[in-house]
């Protein structure tokens, strides 16, 4: 096969269709009820190294407004608001947003963070932020959707300046690889970032890619 043919097949491949097929084959889809049960464990008491690294890569300008899609309990929304950024913090889990509300009150961030119950698969024209509502829209390890292309397009329509997405490029940070290896358990590595990159190329974007470590750290 010549190089030209290889490039043609790559660019014409139905990356989003393959993503949707993979999501349909998953053993259990992510839903708000699962995250509701985890919410009490997610109250951010400090800015984690991952959040600091991600915020550095965002390279926000002073005072820029942001959409944090899939904000969880506010591990990134809270430090961004503390830095003076107006934040729309959206999540599909009411319990996560309840934990976020507690964090907003604890840190005195009323008026800086606007919680919003919102799922990727919702009709954003009806319940989502308006087009170009914020300077920067991002999703940090939170692209839980059957339609990846649609999700990326929703971020794009919401942002005036730029969008950012982080996706796991190895095993999930939920797992301790040292422990899993020690007990002989297998861990499935994620390749979702490959689909995101190629879908963005097909959408006419020129995505910038950066890899950074996100080591697991347990505290007791």
Question: Predicted regions span which residues?
Answer:
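Short, glycine-/aromatic-enriched active-site segment of Class I SAM-dependent methyltransferases
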Residues: 168-187
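Class I SAM-dependent methyltransferase SAM/SAH-binding core
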Residues: 82-123
